[in-house]
Amino acid sequence: MSTNPNTPAPPASRTNPISLRIYKAIGTSFDDVSSREALEIASGMYGPEDPKAKVKAQPEYEELEEDDDTLPKRRTLKGQSAAIARKYLKQDIETCLATGSTKFLEAFAEVDQKLNVLREHMQEMQVRCDQVQSELDQANSGTKFLLERADVLRSQRDSAQLRAHLITLFLSRFTLSNSELTALTSREVTIGQPLFDALDHVEKIRTDCEVLLSGEEGKAQAGLDIMSLTSEQLESGYSKIHRYCQFEFRQFTREAQLEASSVMRQAICRLRDRPALLADAIQTLTSTRQSSILHQFLDALTRGGPGGLPRPIEIHAHDPTRYVGDMLAWVHQTTATEHEFLEGMFGVKEKKRWVGQERGGEEGEEERMASEVLDKDLEGLSRPLKLRIQETIKSQEGIIMTYKIANLLHFYLVTMRKTIGGKAMLVQTLQEIHDQAYIAFYETLDAQGRGLLRFLHPPDATLTPPITLRDAAQILRELLFVYSTSLIDPAERESDADLAKLLDKAVGPCVEMCERMAEMRRGKSGGGEWERDIFMVNSLGYLEHTLEMYDFTTKTLHMLDEKIKTHVESMTFEHHGKLLESCGLAAVMRTIRTRPEDTPLSRLHATSPKSLTSALSKFSTWISTVDPSTSPRLALLTSPRLAVEIHRKALRKIYDAYGEICERVLDKAEGYEFGETMLRRGRDEVGVALGVGEDWELEEDTEEKSMKQKEQQDEDTEDQGEKGIMQEEHKAQDAGNTEDKA
């Protein structure tokens, strides 16, 4: 019968001691380290005898042996280990424990003996320590005062060191070093960056000292002492800078030496904090530069440059424009050089403004100082320059030369005003000379106008502009040419008061002279208004042609054009009357204009059918002989355009008169029975014959434009010739000036 091992045992076996022991043995685990170690020790105690050992007679039981490790070692026979172990295990273990305890007791006895010896030594050492402590206590009680004194001295030393450190910091902050004091006070140390750094340090000390002044009484007194000391140091430093500036300013006597170093610029900048010292130093500079510039100007006038080049300015005293121009050019060049030097010395910031360019905006402190010094430097030039230019102006008799000098003065006045400002004394002097020059010019111009009106005579038979008018127009042309070269903005020339005054004084007497001469011609020859109008149109046209060369004479041209139009209208009216008489329609038109309203034209004598037929026959003959483009009566007009215009307007009025006559003849109310047969020519046919048909206005405008273009071309050719002559003259003068200046 087979039994399943997994089948649980019956309940009776669970109470069996053997079964329980077996289950206990089976269930016991010997995997832990301590159990294994115990088993290994036990197995070592009862191990079999080495077979290679010497064989002796063995008793029935084995004797107990002990090894060096106090563990019992029994010799067993082969196969008896387990039995011996079960028999003697408890006994052997107890024996082992007893043996081990004995050894421990022996060892502890020896240790106890050693500890007794150590205790004796410790007791002896304790006695010695007590003696030392007693002596130490006696020493401490004897040196207590010294220790306390040492602690007090140590604390005092630390306090003194702290105070010394604070004093060192205080002195380093509120006093100057030896090198800084030397830089401020010693004459052997030159002006430089160390001096400026020392001044900055003094200023910083004074700023920091304000904290002390607002503190306690002791601190406030220290602050006052520091402020007093630093004030003396500052004054010493500024005095040194002041002496340096005065010395350097006295060296600026020649143009080659005009160069301001960075140290000089910074020194002047520092002296601004002491206005009195700066003013005194600048006074030295202005007196030095004023004297130097004046001597240079006199040398340029009388001695010329080094080696004789350029030549002395007074050599050209015979040429007024060059003489005055050279003096003003020298002054302007010197002004530019001096202005550049002063701007560099005073540290004016660069604003990209060229010399002569207009000054803009508010000036800074540096620019104001530079302008004031420049004004004083150039002050010495005012008197000699003024005397020489005034003498030159007074010696001139020609109006052109006087105006050239005045215009030259105006050019440099505008330039200098933009460079150094209008308040400078030199500019005011130039303004005074400029005003005097213009006064002299206007006086000469007035004298010329009075001369034109003093000796008048009737125009000649050609009715051309008189020679006096031509001379005056030539002078006016040259004056306007000089004016066109001025610095006045072209957009402002039309409103320039000086130009208006010039044109009024130059053109007014000419027009008045022509009007008086025309009246004399009318009274002498009996030509009436016709010759007067022709002479006035020719003369005014000549003046107008003179002014047309320049675009800034619009107002005067408009005035002359209005006068010319008035005379042209008068001539047109008179010419129409003459043509109306010659064509035979004058009596007819007078009757039409003056007839009673209730009377037909056919019943009036001048417009009766017979008289009207005769008049129309004469008109038909006249129209075949008349020249529609010009008339011999207008041959004396110097302007072909105006002659054609007057003639064509008169013919147009003839055409209109003939048209009105045709309307009256064809009107049944006028009483003409055969009106169509009376009119030999139609209205359009007359218009074509006279050249004044329906398209007359368009043709007239076209012809007028062509005539104007032709006249303008002729005038431009003449103007170019005259301008070329004037430009050649000016070029020749400029070439001479350039050659001498070279």
Curated annotation (Swiss-Prot):
Keyword flag Transport: yes
Composition skew (Acidic residues), residue ranges: 694-703
InterPro entries: COG6, COG6_C, COG6_N
Alphabetical UniProt keywords: Golgi apparatus, Membrane, Protein transport, Transport
Biased composition (Basic and acidic residues): 720-742
Top-rank taxon: Eukaryota
Single Gene Ontology BP annotation: intra-Golgi vesicle-mediated transport
Entry membrane topology: Peripheral membrane protein
Chief localization: Golgi
Region (Disordered): 692-742
Recorded GO CC terms: Golgi membrane; Golgi transport complex
One Pfam family of this chain: COG6_N
Localization: Golgi apparatus membrane
Family membership noted in the UniProt record: Belongs to the COG6 family.
Function recorded in the entry: Acts as a component of the peripheral membrane COG complex that is involved in intra-Golgi protein trafficking. COG is located at the cis-Golgi, and regulates tethering of retrograde intra-Golgi vesicles and possibly a number of other membrane trafficking events.
Entries under PANTHER family matching the protein: COMPONENT OF OLIGOMERIC GOLGI COMPLEX 6, CONSERVED OLIGOMERIC GOLGI COMPLEX SUBUNIT 6
Protein's recorded name: Conserved oligomeric Golgi complex subunit 6
Organism field: Cryptococcus neoformans var. neoformans serotype D (strain JEC21 / ATCC MYA-565)
